[in-house]
Amino acid sequence: MKLQGKVAAITGATAGIGRGIAEAFLAEGASVALMARNATKAEAVLAELGVGNRAVFIAGDATVQADVEGFVDKAAAQFGKLDILVNNAGGATGLQPLVDLSDQSFDEAMKWNVYATFWACRRALKTMLAAQSGRIINISSVEGKHGKPVLTAYSAAKHAVNGLTKALAREVGTQGVTVNAICPGLVITDIIRNNGPDTAKAMGMSFDEMVDMFAQESAIKRPNTVEEIAAVAVLLASPEGGGITGATISVDGGSAQY
């Protein structure tokens, strides 16, 4: 098992990519602390995972600094150390043309995607630098490499996450800590199913038309899967990933080429 005995803290971990990464880490022998806002859903996920005390839920809102920092502290305290941080919480907000985008919507995109990542990284580094060992994996987006109409705030936020990733990797590279970002393309998760219709409407098309448009932008002409994202996260967290840092890895079926 590639992650035997390792401890991971994962934000936004009860569904979609976050849950997929949690499942993959558990399968490789890690223990995981999961942060999410919905306690009822989180407890149901823990029961479904069925791994006993190797997985714990810690309530928190990624847009609240005290919650994010408290989550990192509690995860380390629960398991006695912290080896891996996965910043998965985030998402698209402010789905309007820029001329209609409010300051509040832009701020929300930054807080959910950028500040949540910043707060968690800063807190986790206190433990990781003391141990001279750690892996930070930020879940960004293909929109952190290019942009799309009405996704201006989200694209700006994910560009910021990628910039933070690259700079921090150089800052801590000689201290045993790697920092990377995974940039997924289209992945059909619950949040996409729930929020996608509004995005599609803002773009002047149906949800199915939007999904097909995004899929056709890729070389493989289909959405990526959660499992494909999780496999890259396992590599970055594993001993084999020790030489990878400062990378913004596209798992997008080739859409970042276009």
Feature-to-residue mapping (PLM):
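Conserved glycine-rich Rossmann-like NAD(P)H-binding loop of the short-chain dehydrogenase/reductase
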Residues: 28-44
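Active-site helix of classical SDR
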Residues: 121, 157, 165
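C-terminal substrate-recognition "lid" of short-chain dehydrogenase/reductases
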Residues: 2, 79, 118, 133, ...
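Substrate-binding pocket helix/loop in short-chain dehydrogenase/reductase
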Residues: 96-98, 102-110, 136, 214
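Short, small/polar-rich loop/turn modules that mediate ligand/substrate recognition or access, typified
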Residues: 173, 178, 244-246
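Conserved glycine-rich cofactor-binding loop
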Residues: 7, 14-16
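Residue(s) in the substrate-gating loop at a strand-loop-helix junction
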Residues: 141
